[in-house]
């Protein structure tokens, strides 16, 4: 019995032309015959040469290769809810931090100014070449052939990511010049389609009186692609020379009555601003932003997409252009178009534009008022799959990238480093946007279906083992920010219970509400029944529900993305940050009911200092509640003392990490001195003593002094200090009486 030889199976669409293959194979019959190996190799080489000659003769009829992607080598398996093509993503990491707020120890998610931005191609919709006479309509993508080579856009999502690819970028009018951009990350949409000689399947954007005429530009024979296989560029004009196009000329094209020229001008601006930062200022000075905003009202989808992409790149990391876009009513026009259009490519550019705009303080109020309803109703709620059963909202198909951009727009970024406080405090910042601003938080919490949709999406991804989905990260950062000061800003059952408990203590106390008993109540050192949970939480009720806590802990146990881990820990940190009943209730849910301490303790082993800081601060908040001391002692003490023993203090977060660790150890050792004694090594004590003397880390120094003072006050632990050669006088010199009195009174 003869077996058929093994061959490589590729997709059918790759072989619509029988010669379109990377390997020319002999026929099955020849493979089965007794020909020698040498002869078969010779036949294969001849067939390959013949195929290449055949392809070269056809190069004038195909505008690009069958692998229609502007970028190569990118993959992240991001395929949830995808359409006919695949989407590939990779990411660049941005750091995180905190800023002190006088009462709470919570966080708001922030990103530094060096934000990750992305670039993707729209080759699927813009790279088809329609031969003369093939159809008489102008579809979305049939007007412009030249611009198929130079369309790129970028956004500034505040994401952690791990760079996996490089941008191979050919300069305009040059051949395949490659540049590695390590600080960038890119996601591309690969159509996987070859050029097909047929009419476009998408609905036409406008009627054309005659078929477009495609002629090669005189001086446009060089490759203009970004890491794309070389193909000839063509435009629908007799005289346009792509290599001679300049920013002033492109801005003039924007005012042309010909829609093809409008699109060419906008795409050239988009492409040039992607490559050259100085082009943004030039377009601004020439009044191009006003013209691009006007083009968002064009009836032609090609022009709409080109204008949105150009604005997206123009405002990227340019505050001047962002403010000018707002001044020209660009936000309202973008939101209006997003509300009207069903074109996924236009939606991607518009949501990317709104994301870029959302990083500027001056625009946040207008974005909250105008953009939030459209982003929620047209993108986030439909894509998440959440439904309350009473809504008549349309369930349109939403592209995953549009959802990613929309959640990124709601996600906050901060320009200043946040600080964790020594006493229970939340972090805030002077630079905020949508979900981080006070008014923005309240508006988003009150928006019907928004929190429900974000939570539903995260829970669905956790259930499907897609914990590293990049939109999960965005959703978690929004939920993290919405949990900030939740107990103070949102009426909860904990607040009512606390009010009842305060009244009960006041009635029993003869010394009034400012007695020691009242202070004891405020510090949660008393037993009080926790409120019953809602069976079906809605809106802000989700933020402190046990189902949400369970979801966060599951993510912390399964996700490998540092930004997601930090957001989960930050949300829990905010919930445990107050000095009221909510902190006690949330801490009990996390540590006792959901048994989440092992997941939190693992965060302290992370190589990312932002993750370690969030985990250490969360444990510090939880350690204030004596009910948790026993369970925390066995599960947390080893990891926390390891931080004090081995942490080098060479990161920007070291002071926050060490101060949180000192307070956690201080709280736990008070109830379990014998357990603490097992983990107090000489190296740990030496580090604590060095911290006391440190002038570079005042917060950590004060926390270390308090820890030493409490150790000396404990009969079980005083001997440990004496063994290291310390006495009362030396300890007094290290601690400093004034600072000790001040900090002790704060506790």
Swiss-Prot record:
One of its GO terms (molecular function) is cadherin binding. Residues 48-68 are annotated as: Disordered. Changing residue 118 to A: Reduces the interaction with YWHAG. One of its GO terms (biological process) is positive regulation of gene expression. GO terms for cellular component: adherens junction; cornified envelope; cytoplasm; cytoplasmic stress granule; desmosome; ficolin-1-rich granule membrane; intermediate filament; nuclear stress granule. Changing residue 155 to A: Abolishes interaction with YWHAG. Changing residue 54 to A: No effect on interaction with YWHAG. Changing residue 119 to A: Reduces the interaction with YWHAG. Residues 160-269 are annotated as: Required for WNT-mediated nuclear localization. ARM repeats lie at residues 243-274, 275-316, 317-359, 360-415, 416-463, 525-556, 557-603, 604-649, 650-713. InterPro entries: ARM-like, ARM-type_fold, Armadillo, Plakophilin/d_Catenin. Residues 54-69, 116-191 are annotated as: Phosphorylation in this region is required for cytoplasmic localization and protein stabilization. Residues 1-286 are annotated as: Required for interaction with EIF4A1. Phosphorylated by AKT2; required for interaction with YWHAG and subsequent localization away from desmosomes to the cytoplasm. Phosphorylation of Ser-118 by AKT2 promotes PKP1-driven cap-dependent mRNA translation and decreases intercellular adhesion, phosphorylation is promoted by insulin. Phosphorylation by RIPK4 at the N-terminus is required for its role in differentiation of keratinocytes and DSG1 localization at cell junctions. It is found in: Nucleus; Cytoplasm, Perinuclear region; Cytoplasm; Cell junction, Desmosome. A component of desmosome cell-cell junctions which are required for positive regulation of cellular adhesion. Plays a role in desmosome protein expression regulation and localization to the desmosomal plaque, thereby maintaining cell sheet integrity and anchorage of desmosomes to intermediate filaments. Required for localization of DSG3 and YAP1 to the cell membrane in keratinocytes in response to mechanical strain, via the formation of an interaction complex composed of DSG3, YAP1, PKP1 and YWHAG. Belongs to the beta-catenin family. It is linked to Ectodermal dysplasia-skin fragility syndrome: A form of ectodermal dysplasia, a heterogeneous group of disorders due to abnormal development of two or more ectodermal structures. Characterized by features of both cutaneous fragility and congenital ectodermal dysplasia affecting skin, hair and nails. There is no evidence of significant abnormalities in other epithelia or tissues. Desmosomes in the skin are small and poorly formed with widening of keratinocyte intercellular spaces and perturbed desmosome/keratin intermediate filament interactions. Part of a complex that contains DSG3, PKP1, YAP1 and YWHAG; the complex is required for localization of DSG3 and YAP1 to the cell membrane in keratinocytes. Interacts with DSP. Interacts (via N-terminus) with KRT5/CK5, KRT8/CK8 (via rod domain), KRT15/CK15 and KRT18/CK18 (via rod domain) as part of intermediate filaments. Interacts with VIM (via rod domain). Interacts with DSP. Interacts with DES. Interacts with FXR1; the interaction may facilitate the binding of PKP1 to PKP2, PKP3 and DSP mRNA. This is Plakophilin-1.
């Amino acid at each position: 019995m003869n077996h058929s030889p093994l061959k490589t199976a590729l997709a059918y669409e790759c072989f619509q032309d029988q010669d379109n293959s990377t390997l020319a194979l002999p026929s099955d019959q020849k493979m089965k015959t007794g020909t020698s190996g040498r002869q078969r190799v010779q036949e294969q080489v001849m067939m390959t040469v013949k195929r290449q000659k055949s392809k070269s003769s056809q190069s004038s009829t195909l505008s690009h290769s069958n692998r229609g992607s502007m970028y190569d080598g990118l993959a992240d398996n991001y395929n949830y809810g995808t359409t006919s093509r695949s989407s590939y993503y990779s990411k660049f990491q941005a750091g995180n931090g905190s800023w002190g707020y006088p009462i709470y120890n919570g966080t708001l998610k922030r990103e530094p100014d060096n934000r990750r931005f992305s670039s993707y191609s729209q080759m699927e919709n813009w790279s088809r070449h329609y031969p003369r006479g093939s159809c008489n309509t102008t579809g979305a993508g049939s007007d412009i052939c030249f611009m198929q080579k130079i369309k790129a856009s970028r956004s500034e999502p505040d994401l952690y990511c791990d760079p996996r690819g490089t941008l191979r970028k050919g300069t305009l009018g040059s051949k395949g010049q490659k540049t590695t951009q390590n600080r960038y990350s890119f996601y591309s949409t690969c159509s996987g389609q070859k050029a097909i000689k047929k009419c476009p399947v998408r609905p036409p954007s406008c009627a054309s009186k005659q078929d477009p005429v495609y002629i090669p530009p005189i001086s446009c024979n060089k490759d203009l692609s970004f890491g794309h296989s070389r193909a000839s560029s063509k435009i629908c004009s007799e005289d346009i020379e792509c290599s001679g196009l300049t920013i002033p000329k492109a801005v003039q094209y924007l005012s042309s009555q010909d829609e093809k020229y409008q699109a060419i001008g906008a795409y050239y601006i988009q492409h040039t601003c992607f490559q050259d930062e100085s082009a943004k200022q030039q377009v601004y000075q020439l009044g191009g932003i006003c013209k691009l905003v006007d083009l968002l009202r064009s009836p032609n989808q090609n022009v709409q997409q080109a204008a949105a992409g150009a604005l997206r790149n123009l405002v990227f990391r340019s505050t001047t252009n962002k403010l000018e876009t707002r001044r020209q009513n660009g936000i309202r026009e973008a939101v209006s178009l997003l509300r009207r259009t069903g074109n996924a490519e236009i939606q991607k550019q518009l949501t990317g534009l709104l994301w870029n705009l959302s990083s500027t303080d001056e625009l946040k109020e207008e974005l909250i008022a105008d953009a939030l309803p459209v982003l929620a109703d047209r993108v986030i709620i439909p894509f998440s799959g959440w439904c309350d059963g009473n809504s008549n909202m349309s369930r349109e198909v939403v592209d995953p990238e549009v959802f990613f951009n929309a959640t990124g727009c709601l996600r906050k970024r901060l320009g200043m480093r946040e600080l964790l406080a020594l006493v229970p405090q939340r972090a805030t910042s002077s630079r905020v946007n949508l979900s981080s601003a006070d008014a923005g938080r309240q508006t988003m919490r009150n928006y019907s279906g928004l929190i429900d949709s974000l939570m539903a999406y995260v829970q669905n991804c956790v259930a499907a083992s897609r914990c590293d989905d990049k939109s999960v990260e965005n959703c978690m950062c929004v939920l993290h920010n919405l949990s900030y000061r939740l107990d103070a800003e949102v009426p909860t059952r904990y607040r009512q219970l606390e009010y009842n408990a305060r009244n009960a203590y006041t009635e029993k106390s003869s010394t009034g509400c400012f007695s020691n008993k009242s202070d004891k109540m405020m510090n949660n050192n008393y037993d009080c029944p926790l409120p019953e949970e809602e069976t079906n939480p809605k809106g802000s009720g989700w933020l402190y529900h046990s189902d949400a806590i369970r979801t966060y802990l599951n993510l912390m146990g399964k996700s490998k993305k540092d930004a997601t881990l930090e957001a989960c820990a930050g949300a829990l940190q905010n919930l445990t940050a107050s000095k009221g009943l909510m902190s006690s209730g949330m801490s009990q849910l996390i540590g006792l009911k959901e048994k989440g301490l092992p997941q939190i303790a693992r965060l302290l082993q992370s190589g990312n200092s932002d993750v370690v800081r969030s985990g250490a601060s969360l444990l510090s908040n939880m350690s204030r509640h004596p009910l948790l001391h026993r369970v925390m002692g066995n599960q947390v003490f080893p990891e926390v003392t390891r931080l004090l023993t081995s942490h080098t203090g060479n990161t920007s977060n070291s002071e926050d990490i060490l101060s949180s660790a000192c307070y956690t150890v201080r709280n736990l050792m008070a109830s379990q001195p014998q357990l603490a004694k097992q983990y107090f090594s000489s190296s740990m004590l030496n580090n604590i003593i060095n911290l006391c003397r440190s002038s570079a880390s005042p917060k950590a120094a004060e926390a270390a002094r308090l820890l030493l003072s409490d150790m000396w006050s404990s009969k079980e632990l005083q001997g440990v200090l004496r063994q290291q050669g310390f006495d009362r006088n030396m300890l007094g010199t290290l601690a400093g009486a004034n600072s000790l009195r001040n900090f002790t009174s704060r506790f």
